From Swiss-Prot:
Origin species: Treponema pallidum (strain Nichols)
Keywords: Cell membrane, Membrane, Transmembrane, Transmembrane helix
Protein name stated in the entry: Uncharacterized protein TP_0473
Domain of life according to the entry: Bacteria
Entry keyword annotation includes DNA-binding: no
Localization annotation: Cell membrane
Membrane association type: Multi-pass membrane protein
Principal location: membrane
TM segment ranges: 4-23, 35-57, 67-89, 96-118, 128-150, 155-177, 187-209
């Protein structure tokens, strides 16, 4: 029981640790931290709204499309709605605000993942939580890399839109993998696919963000 508690704590702090690592070299780390907290707070009303719609998609449903919608829409797309609210409250579409929007999304997905872990504390199987964490980390790194690259172009807003489209495509792929894993016992194959996507995300982030900073 104690071991599970330690693992759960480690899973919960993984996203904030990834955030601090990703934005350690940001121009204004304090501003990025404030944006992270802002996103985490904005996620609260979305979580309440999400709980209302989740009743239409039972977690033990035998329908592939319902499980896919549950993974993609409720665990992945819902936190994205924090971004327009964040940009609206920031009252700015400048490059700094757009990059800070990624920090806000890190906070939003951290809140969603915390609730995801909390609601499954009694489930001894950690696979779903670990895969959800890998999904979030992989795609947030990809988003940060693409947004950082697009901010160096002449049309940063269009670059952000393109980055979000890639983000959604990656999310659809990840949700598909998780759905297949839900209906099939070959977990090693599907976790390997997510791990491969995570490796690509790390390389993309390294070349788009780290090398540019240095």
């Amino acid at each position: 029981m104690v071991t599970v508690s330690i693992v759960e704590i480690f899973l919960i702090i993984s996203l904030p640790l990834l955030f601090f690592s990703s934005f350690a070299d940001a121009g204004d780390p304090l501003q990025e931290l404030i944006s992270f907290v802002h996103g985490a707070v904005l996620a609260v009303p979305l979580l309440l709204l999400r709980s209302f719609f989740l009743g239409y998609y039972p977690p033990d449903s035998a329908l592939v499309e319902e499980q896919w919608m549950r993974f993609f829409l409720f665990d992945y797309v819902f936190p994205l709605f924090c971004l327009p609210f964040f940009l609206f409250t920031s009252r700015s579409l400048e490059r700094v605000s757009l990059v800070s929007g990624v920090s806000a999304l890190f906070g939003a997905y951290t809140s969603f993942f915390f609730v995801h872990v909390y609601t499954q504390l009694n489930d001894p199987d950690l696979l779903a939580r670990v895969m959800t964490l890998v999904l979030y980390m992989t795609n947030l790194l990809q988003l940060h890399a693409h947004v950082s690259f697009s901010m160096r172009t002449r049309l940063p807003l269009l670059g952000l839109i393109a980055a979000l489209c890639i983000f959604l495509l990656m999310g659809a792929f990840s949700a598909t993998v998780m759905t297949l894993c839900f209906f099939n016992a070959r977990t090693v194959v599907y976790t390997s696919m997510l791990a491969g996507a995570g490796g690509v995300a790390l390389l993309t982030h390294f070349f788009a963000v780290r090398i540019n900073v240095r």
